[in-house]
Amino acid sequence: MNKVLIAAAGTGGHIFPALAVAEQMRDNGWQVDWLGTQEGRLESRVIPAANFPLHSISMTGVRGHGLKRKLFMPFTLAKAVLQCRRLLKTLQPQVVATFGGYVCAPMGLAAKLLGIPLVVHEQNAIPGMTTRLLAPRANKVMLGLPVALPQWQQYPVVGNPLRKGLLAQAAEQTEKSNTDGALNILVVGGSLGAQVLNEAVPEAVKALEGVELNVLHQCGAEREATTEKAYLGASVLKTLKVTEFIEDMGDAFKNADLVICRAGALTISELAVMGVASILVPLPHAVDDHQSANAKVLESRGAAVLLPQTEVVEGALKQQLKRLLHDRQQLWTMARFARQCAMPEATQRLVNECMEYRQSDD
């Protein structure tokens, strides 16, 4: 049986694109093993639930940590490479595919030491540290979003793999043309919520007049009551639903006329494939400010408005909402431009690349 080892750890932005590829590889008859970290809380829940064998190594990052960890990093990396080398000798995969997180560095290096083909996928518009390390050593590098840096122009942009359910909903999505009635606003701060959006969006909505809105606001854990209270006095509200978590994001995107959210790589790809106008507020402390670069992918195509968090706090969100919500044609134009950025074949393209290294049938 053909085997692939997938390495992805830490955040959903790394894990969920890898999971989409893993599921498709399994459907194609491949055995899939997964590498995470011993501290990886997300992969320790998600990967076994998807019925993939999960292996782990002792590997930690250096960003945001003290000098001691940085000084010991060469030894930590060498130890992790040896662990990965042993694992690869045991599993004997035909190909290794990395999707981000610190486990990818030692696994990618171990794969090259053993002569195992290495496929690297980078989700963000600014490549992460492990991608920068592995790209010169990889057999194939594929990008989820365009990277503006000149040295990355040689690599193909294939898009970010997305969940099957969301892609199915996107295929059924019709072009938006809500010419009258209430407009639907979706506010998403990520799985943990975003306090700045919980405060700024209600204030901006209360300043509106002459429109009617249905607002669905995902606020994060234990913020439901205070966020809902912040909307008191908003005369333009037809309906308001504040929730800690949205189970079906595909349905939420499908019904939205405008989304106000952060600018993670998967969010950018989901907005594009669903064809929705957006106001993007990048997380200001993201590594290498990669969310601002992600947001510019849609902004540069006329599909989104980019608002730095400092401007949101200073009240710019009010002006943008007034402008967009009183010009429905502008919203539909942005939605159409967003759809033009979509790359729904990302999963299949990555799967095809990995399958290039399958065993001969002879």
Swiss-Prot record:
- Keywords carried by this UniProt record: Cell cycle, Cell division, Cell inner membrane, Cell membrane, Cell shape, Cell wall biogenesis/degradation, Glycosyltransferase, Membrane, Peptidoglycan synthesis, Transferase
Q: Cross-referenced InterPro entries, in alphabetical order? A: GlcNAc_MurG, Glyco_trans_28_C, GlycoTrans_28_N
Q: What are its E.C. numbers?
A: 2.4.1.227
Q: Kindly state one GO CC term assigned in the UniProt record.
A: plasma membrane
Q: Per the UniProt entry, what is one GO biological process? A: regulation of cell shape
Major location, coarse class? membrane
Q: Where does UDP-N-acetyl-alpha-D-glucosamine bind?
A: T11, G12, G13, N124, R163, S191, I246, Q291
Among its keywords, does the record have Transmembrane?
no
Annotated membrane-spanning segments are none
Q: Which CDD domains match?
A: GT28_MurG (cd03785)
Q: What class of enzyme is it?
A: transferase
What's the catalysed reaction?
A: di-trans,octa-cis-undecaprenyl diphospho-N-acetyl-alpha-D-muramoyl-L-alanyl-D-glutamyl-meso-2,6-diaminopimeloyl-D-alanyl-D-alanine + UDP-N-acetyl-alpha-D-glucosamine = di-trans,octa-cis-undecaprenyl diphospho-[N-acetyl-alpha-D-glucosaminyl-(1->4)]-N-acetyl-alpha-D-muramoyl-L-alanyl-D-glutamyl-meso-2,6-diaminopimeloyl-D-alanyl-D-alanine + UDP + H(+)
Q: In which pathway does it act?
A: Cell wall biogenesis; peptidoglycan biosynthesis
SUPFAM superfamilies, alphabetized: UDP-Glycosyltransferase/glycogen phosphorylase (SSF53756)
* Topology class, membrane: Peripheral membrane protein
Any Pfam family the entry gives:
Glyco_transf_28
Which locations, inside or outside the cell, does it occupy? Answer: Cell inner membrane
Q: Which domain of life is it from?
A: Bacteria
Entry's Gene Ontology molecular function annotations: UDP-N-acetyl-D-glucosamine:N-acetylmuramoyl-L-alanyl-D-glutamyl-meso-2,6-diaminopimelyl-D-alanyl-D-alanine-diphosphoundecaprenol 4-beta-N-acetylglucosaminlytransferase activity; undecaprenyldiphospho-muramoylpentapeptide beta-N-acetylglucosaminyltransferase activity
Functional description taken from the UniProt entry: Cell wall formation. Catalyzes the transfer of a GlcNAc subunit on undecaprenyl-pyrophosphoryl-MurNAc-pentapeptide (lipid intermediate I) to form undecaprenyl-pyrophosphoryl-MurNAc-(pentapeptide)GlcNAc (lipid intermediate II).
PANTHER family on file: GLYCOSYLTRANSFERASE (PTHR21015:SF22), UDP-N-ACETYLGLUCOSAMINE--N-ACETYLMURAMYL-(PENTAPEPTIDE) PYROPHOSPHORYL-UNDECAPRENOL N-ACETYLGLUCOSAMINE TRANSFERASE 1 (PTHR21015)
Q: Which family does it belong to?
A: Belongs to the glycosyltransferase 28 family. MurG subfamily.
Q: Output the NCBIfam families linked to this UniProt entry.
A: murG
HAMAP family, per this entry?
MurG (MF_00033)
Q: What is this protein called?
A: UDP-N-acetylglucosamine--N-acetylmuramyl-(pentapeptide) pyrophosphoryl-undecaprenol N-acetylglucosamine transferase
